[in-house]
């Protein structure tokens, strides 16, 4: 299953800086996206540098998804993209403009191919899906603020592609070393632009059921990579929070009650964690904002010790103490 690991984007211009965190990440054979037609990267040593970069990535265990256009053919002085694929030892090709249907079909029989999710017409690629090895559709990333996709369009396109048997790929922003010249993140969805990579990954995976997630930016912190990998390995969701009034809850694994209403998450184990004769005095009984972590105090009688995480704003209640807060960049996980 592809969603078992995060994909990365590697750029020639930032490759030396990216090596540091990519070292050792390749052991699960994650996919890595490399574009072979970024005009500002072209130089006299372009093909040599690209060759060296791809060799390193393959050596480390990554599987390369190369974005090719007819421009790439000129650069590498070859007559077909198949030759580029062999030359750089790529796993899959993303075909943008400039390729006709017959070429695509021939390639699809040999290797996974990736098409542009926004321009693909499902009825035109039925034969590719039927006869090809694997057909994927990749949403774009959007460097300029306010140009990322809205939720409704994204969901509609994603679902129609998946219904046709096509795996869907989308991008999340990084949190360090963002891609220039705008430096505002490379998400597919606009509302992911300023949240944590982890929260964006979780939403794409759990809410939108995307098959594969790539980081669009060249940089993502080891902290975020580890959180994402940990979810992929264990299925446990990590919720960063500050717990000023309940330090003993840090690093505890808890279960969300399956019957939690949409406005709160009820923690299943909470009342069990309370000692029989423990008193919970009213404290910090203020308005419950989104992300507030609450504990019912003694005034709530047998509910004393009940712990909840707030998903929609609720009024203050003198029986409910606020014991902490989910970190702002991770609120969408809720």
Predicted regions and their residues:
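Catalytic alpha/beta core domains of metabolic enzymes, predominantly
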Residues: 116-243
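Active-site beta->alpha loop and helix N-cap motifs at the rims of alpha/beta catalytic domains
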Residues: 3-130, 134
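Short acidic, gly/pro-rich beta-turn/loop elements at beta-sheet edges
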Residues: 18, 76, 147, 225, ...
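Short, flexible, solvent-exposed loop/turn segments with mixed acidic/basic and small polar residues
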Residues: 1-2, 205
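C-terminal functional modules
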Residues: 242-334
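Residues in well-ordered beta-strands of folded domains
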Residues: 9, 138, 240, 308-310
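Short secondary-structure transition/capping segments
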Residues: 9, 76-88, 107-120, 161-165, ...
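Electropositive, surface-exposed helix/loop patches at the edges of structured domains
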Residues: 66-81, 97-105, 152-156, 206-215, ...
């Amino acid at each position: 299953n592809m969603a078992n690991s995060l994909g990365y984007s590697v750029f020639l211009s930032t490759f030396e800086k990216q090596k540091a965190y990519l070292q050792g990440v390749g052991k699960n054979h994650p996919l890595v996206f490399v574009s072979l037609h970024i005009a500002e990267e072209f130089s006299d040593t372009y093909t040599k540098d690209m060759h060296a970069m791809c060799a390193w990535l393959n050596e480390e265990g990554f599987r390369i998804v190369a974005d090719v256009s007819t421009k790439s053919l000129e650069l590498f002085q070859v007559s077909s993209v198949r030759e580029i694929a062999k030359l750089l030892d790529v796993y899959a090709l993303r075909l943008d403009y400039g390729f006709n249907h017959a070429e695509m079909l021939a390639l699809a029989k040999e290797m996974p191919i990736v098409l542009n999710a926004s321009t693909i017409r499902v009825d035109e690629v039925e034969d590719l899906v039927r006869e090809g090895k694997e057909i994927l559709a990749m949403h774009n990333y959007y460097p300029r603020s306010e140009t990322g996709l809205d939720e409704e369009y994204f969901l509609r396109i994603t679902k129609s592609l998946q219904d046709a048997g096509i795996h869907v790929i989308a991008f999340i922003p990084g949190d360090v070393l963002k891609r220039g010249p705008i430096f505002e993140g490379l998400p597919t969805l606009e509302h992911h632009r300023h949240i944590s990579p982890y929260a964006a990954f979780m939403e794409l995976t759990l809410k939108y059921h995307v098959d594969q997630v790539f980081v669009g930016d060249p940089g993502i912190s080891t902290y975020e990579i580890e959180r994402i990998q940990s979810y992929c390995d264990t299925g446990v969701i990590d919720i960063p929070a500050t717990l000023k009034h309940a330090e003993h809850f840090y690093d505890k694994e808890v279960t969300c009650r399956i019957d939690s209403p949409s406005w709160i998450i009820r923690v299943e184990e909470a009342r069990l964690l309370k000692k029989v004769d423990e008193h919970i005095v009213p404290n910090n009984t203020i308005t419950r904002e989104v992300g507030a972590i609450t504990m019912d105090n003694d005034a709530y009688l047998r509910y004393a010790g009940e712990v909840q995480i707030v998903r929609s704003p609720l009024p203050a209640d003198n029986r409910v103490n606020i014991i902490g807060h989910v970190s702002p960049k991770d609120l969408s996980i809720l």
